[in-house]
Amino acid sequence: DASSFCQLPAVVGKCRGYFPRFYYNTEAGKCQQFIYGGCGGNRNNFETVEDCRATCHSH
């Protein structure tokens, strides 16, 4: 299921970069911003809130 990753938690990753990204927060029922370190993590990681909503908004 292509949208199952929308249920994954936000993961900063092991690198120390500072990249504002968006993830779908299942508890809040909406996309929220978090800081991504630049490597690792999971697919619940979008460059724009629009991409996040387009992929995960139906959950």
Curated annotation (Swiss-Prot):
InterPro entries assigned: Kunitz_BPTI, Kunitz_BPTI_sf, Prtase_inh_Kunz-CS, TFPI/VKTCI-like
First-listed, main subcellular location of the protein, grouped into a coarse class: secreted
Superkingdom to which the source organism belongs: Eukaryota
Cysteine disulfide links: C6-C56, C15-C39, C31-C52
Keywords: Disulfide bond, Ion channel impairing toxin, Nematocyst, Potassium channel impairing toxin, Protease inhibitor, Secreted, Serine protease inhibitor, Toxin
Domain BPTI/Kunitz inhibitor: 6-56
Signal peptide start-end: none
Listed GO CC annotations: extracellular space; nematocyst
SMART domains: KU
Localization of this protein: Secreted; Nematocyst
Molecular function terms, GO-annotated: potassium channel regulator activity; serine-type endopeptidase inhibitor activity; toxin activity
Ligase among keywords: no
Function: Dual-function toxin that inhibits both the serine protease trypsin and voltage-gated potassium channels (Kv).
Family in the record: Belongs to the venom Kunitz-type family. Sea anemone type 2 potassium channel toxin subfamily.
This protein's name: PI-actitoxin-Aeq3b
